[in-house]
From Swiss-Prot:
It comes from the Bacteria. The gene is def1. Keywords: Hydrolase, Iron, Metal-binding, Protein biosynthesis. Its cofactor is Fe(2+). PANTHER family: PEPTIDE DEFORMYLASE (PTHR10458), PEPTIDE DEFORMYLASE, MITOCHONDRIAL (PTHR10458:SF2). SUPFAM superfamilies: Peptide deformylase. The active site is at E178. It catalyses: N-terminal N-formyl-L-methionyl-[peptide] + H2O = N-terminal L-methionyl-[peptide] + formate. Binds 1 Fe(2+) ion. This is Peptide deformylase 1. Fe cation binds at C135, H177, H181. The keyword Transmembrane does not apply. InterPro entries: Peptide_deformylase, Peptide_deformylase_sf.
């Protein structure tokens, strides 16, 4: 795997492999801690909060405010024991998500994506996996949901540089799930009416294990 040439590197930017995808599986513990330790954990918004049900605004300012938001998101994700978190899940109307997730080989990936877009893959690369899926914004509820077991996302890093991220297995599910969030979709929106009702019942019958924002 080749890193970017020195003159193409920017402070805090991940190197890329020969196919142009970020190398997000190196120094994960150190990078996650560096983000998280600068941040403040915030409560999680839950289904019914308007910020979760509309498309978020594009990130256009890649300065100190975004840097602090990303740090807060990593701190919030750790508190909630999640593997991915979108900005609207802590009440911020911006297209950015963070992740700390393993792929189907158990390899850990850590990173940030702003203004993400899922790449439309050809049919022969869309093998579906119908594993259980959950969401911090639908606490304690799980349901099987078929999604492709490979995903590619394009976007920008927290410095505004173009990036490409790819994942397999659970990490592929995470990339799709978090991108959905930023366009106003929860995973339960992709379920049948019966399955959605059951997920909401699970949520109503159990207490979340992390702080949440109460809906009015």
């Amino acid at each position: 795997m080749a890193q970017q040439d020195t003159d193409q590197q920017h402070t805090g930017v991940l190197p890329v492999d020969d196919d142009g995808f970020v190398i997000d599986a190196e120094d994960c513990e150190e990078r996650e801690a560096a983000y998280r330790e600068r941040g403040t954990s915030r409560p999680i918004t839950v289904v019914g909060n308007p910020v979760l049900h509309k498309e978020c605004k594009d990130v256009t300012d890649f300065g100190a405010e975004l840097e602090q938001l990303v740090a807060d998101m990593f701190a919030s994700q750790r508190t909630a024991e999640g593997v991915g978190l979108a900005a609207n899940q802590i009440g911020v109307d911006l297209k950015v998500f963070v992740y700390d997730c393993q792929d189907d080989e158990g390899t850990r990936h850590v990173g940030v994506v702003c203004n993400p877009k899922l790449v439309d893959l050809p049919a022969d690369r869309r093998r579906l996996d119908d594993s259980n899926e959950g969401c911090l914004s639908v606490p304690t509820a799980y349901a099987p949901l078929a999604r492709p077991d490979y995903a590619e996302v394009t976007g920008q890093d927290e410095k505004g540089n173009p990036i490409k991220v790819r994942g397999t297995g659970y990490f592929a599910r995470c990339l799709q799930h978090e991108t959905d969030h930023l366009y106003g979709y929860l995973y339960i929106d992709r379920l049948s009416k019966r399955e959605r009702k059951d997920a909401l019942r699970q949520m109503a019958e159990n207490e979340p294990r992390y702080p949440v924002v109460a809906n009015d």
